[in-house]
Regions:
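Acidic and/or Ser/Thr-rich intrinsically disordered tails and linkers
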Residues: 1-67
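Conserved long hydrophobic alpha-helices within structured protein cores
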Residues: 16, 54, 95-106
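Loop/turn position at the start of each blade in beta-propeller repeats
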Residues: 30-32, 39, 79, 89, ...
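Loop/turn segments within WD40 beta-propeller blades
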Residues: 37-41, 84-91, 135-141
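Conserved beta-strand element within WD40/beta-propeller blades
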Residues: 45-49, 94-98, 144-148
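Per-blade loop-tip surfaces of WD-repeat and WD-like beta-propellers in eukaryotic adaptors/scaffolds
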Residues: 58-70, 102-131, 137-173
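Blade-loop segments of beta-propeller domains
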Residues: 65-94, 121-122, 128-129
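Conserved beta-strand position repeated once per blade in WD40 beta-propeller domains
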Residues: 83, 133, 175-176
Length: 176
């Protein structure tokens, strides 16, 4: 008799409790390589399809429930959102990129959204075409990079919206 060991012997799961999400579907209507979903220890951000521009759904990670038909969204871009990234240093700091050519930083209230949010914490204008990708610096707190479809890479200081560096790329970037 031959016995085989499962390579999954230390993986455990638990069944969702009633009332928790049983499916989440994120759609990105943009031609981008960016993320439609990102998560921090406190929040889940999802690129939400709406008419008239990009919107972002924000959900508290410790308060799972079925999504109501109407709930508060981040509404600040005039075109589709192409990428979402939470800061690795501040759990409620979210960056969003858009086809409108902007990068916006959002400070989500600690108790989540209770009404639509339209005022960003910081706005970065510099790209001449849509912004495709974002990446927070992994070890420097207030630095973020953005790549646009015009083959340009910007490195920004989040605290004062200063351009730290601009690099013209020879080809389109697909990852930062």
């Amino acid at each position: 008799m031959v016995s085989t060991l499962s390579k999954y012997k230390n993986i455990f799961g638990e069944q969702n409790q009633k009332g928790q999400f049983d499916s989440v579907e994120a759609r990105n209507n943009s031609n981008s390589d960016g993320s439609s979903v990102d998560v921090s220890p406190d929040f889940l951000a999802i690129n939400w399809l709406t008419k008239g521009g990009g919107a972002i759904g924000i959900f508290e990670t410790n308060n799972f429930m079925r999504v109501k038909s109407s709930f508060p969204l981040i509404r600040g871009h005039s075109a589709a959102v192409t990428d979402l990234k939470f800061s690795p240093f501040v759990n409620n700091l979210l960056a969003s990129a858009s086809e409108d050519g902007t990068v916006k930083i959002w400070t989500i209230p600690e108790n989540g959204l209770k009404e639509d949010m339209t005022g960003e914490t910081q706005l970065f204008n510099g790209h001449t075409k849509k912004v495709s990708l974002l990446a927070f610096h992994p070890s420097v707190r207030d630095v973020i990079a953005s790549v646009g479809s015009a083959q340009d890479l910007f490195v920004w200081n989040i605290t004062n919206s200063e351009v730290l560096s601009k690099i013209n790329l020879n080809e389109q970037a697909y990852n930062i």
